[in-house]
């Protein structure tokens, strides 16, 4: 009889909570539910294989666009005791409501990367452009309205070793601008973070680089794709103790944004016991097991064929591990002394050469203004494949500092470094024409009647200076990256970055929201109870 009463109680609580999921926010170095209970991720990577797509020429499959598929997978997530998924690429133009609702009803939160395979900050030739900013904000717009949207990832393993640390400045600029966009758009303060590889030389300086500086610039959380624990390892020999000690001074939440070594099969996921133990939870807030779908890399825990799902050997191990761990309950109201902290940016060294001066916020209005006032421009029939030869020739003859983007310390960013390739080529061709009086380039360019710069456009050009190496301070509304924006009509509702510097430390509570505790006893009970049922952190006290 007691079991029957408990079953009814569970069903009632789950039914009551099904209609609403408590948004999760960041306060200092931890995630919290709205009621102040600490949140831990028991997650899994969720990105379908392109080979499984029915659409010819598909670059990636949006895992949040197929409501039937999401509903199909929810019971398996529940069997795994998963409370979060990570998706790596979404199509912002598609409808995500069915999937997000299915996951919300199941108490599952979503962590989404902002990039996609062919729209991302490059490791080898990093830039932060109008087009990339537009892509990232479109993803924000498509997912931010949902209460179970846990956070956005501005880059995944962009910095791979000490040879391309310059790329970090561009990722951090993306973090800054997406955070500003979320705020100016009136969304709740959804965290924006970065996910890195576990590279020995850059591991420490990279983490502190993304954590340091002004609240507006640094990440809200930091993830490491970590595969150090293989087979039946332990807290010490796996390297987990070292990693935990290394990051004990981080001021933002730390997660394993991927984990699950496959060197020993089957994977028993014994690292989960350590990750959610008191040895690690002071620093770490859970993680994302890699991965749900089986693929050629053999990390999956299920195979999918149409509506049919078959669990693989690793599935029950992951399920039992997640179900068995319940971290010690902790609350925002009792942790206030540990939440406020600052992180000053460190000096560069041979392992870390990223500039603390960040690229400016991309502005389409500035680019259109500049381009409309050029007299010597590239012909429309010239293929973009031929642009590189023209850039090479012109930039060997005159300075191209106005379009330069260099994230190596101390950082150098031309006024038009974020414009598209055609606009940048128009700029340097016109500069060459002004210096040498030639605008032919073997028939590739032509003279046109340039527009006169007036009003706001004139102020942009003046701020850039004759060499176009000055930062252009501007304000822009939340549609500053829209393809329909214009320099003459741009409104002024938020301040954009203009080659900002991260030289000073600051509080890391930019993404926090004040918690007033539980709004009622019943809501607090439901959220706390569900956190145990679906993989959260608290223990239900009655």
From Swiss-Prot:
(1,3-beta-D-glucosyl)n 1 binds at residues 88, 156, 290. The GPI-anchor is attached to the protein in the endoplasmic reticulum and serves to target the protein to the cell surface. There, the glucosamine-inositol phospholipid moiety is cleaved off and the GPI-modified mannoprotein is covalently attached via its lipidless GPI glycan remnant to the 1,6-beta-glucan of the outer cell wall layer. InterPro entries: Glucanosyltransferase (IPR004886), Glycoside_hydrolase_SF (IPR017853), X8 (IPR012946). Residues 517-542 form a propeptide. The keyword Phosphoprotein does not apply. GO terms for molecular function: 1,3-beta-glucanosyltransferase activity. SMART domains: X8. Residues 490-515 are annotated as: Disordered. Gene3D superfamilies: 1.20.58.1040, Glycosidases (3.20.20.80). (1,3-beta-D-glucosyl)n 2 binds at residues 157, 198, 203. Keywords: Cell wall, Cell wall biogenesis/degradation, Disulfide bond, Glycoprotein, GPI-anchor, Lipoprotein, Membrane, Secreted, Signal, Transferase. Coiled coil: none annotated. Disulfide bonds join 70-99, 212-345, 230-261, 367-419, 376-439, 395-400. GO terms for cellular component: cell division site; cell periphery; cell septum edging; external side of plasma membrane; extracellular region; fungal-type cell wall; new growing cell tip; old growing cell tip. Its EC number is 2.4.1.-. It is a lipid-anchor; GPI-anchor. It is an enzyme of class 2 (transferase). The keyword Metal-binding does not apply. Pfam families: Glyco_hydro_72 (PF03198), X8 (PF07983). Glycans are attached at residues 35, 91, 161, 249, 279, 406, 484, 502, 509. Its main location: secreted. Splits internally a 1,3-beta-glucan molecule and transfers the newly generated reducing end (the donor) to the non-reducing end of another 1,3-beta-glucan molecule (the acceptor) forming a 1,3-beta linkage, resulting in the elongation of 1,3-beta-glucan chains in the cell wall. Belongs to the glycosyl hydrolase 72 family. This is 1,3-beta-glucanosyltransferase gas1. The lineage of its organism: Eukaryota, Fungi, Dikarya, Ascomycota, Taphrinomycotina. The gene is gas1.
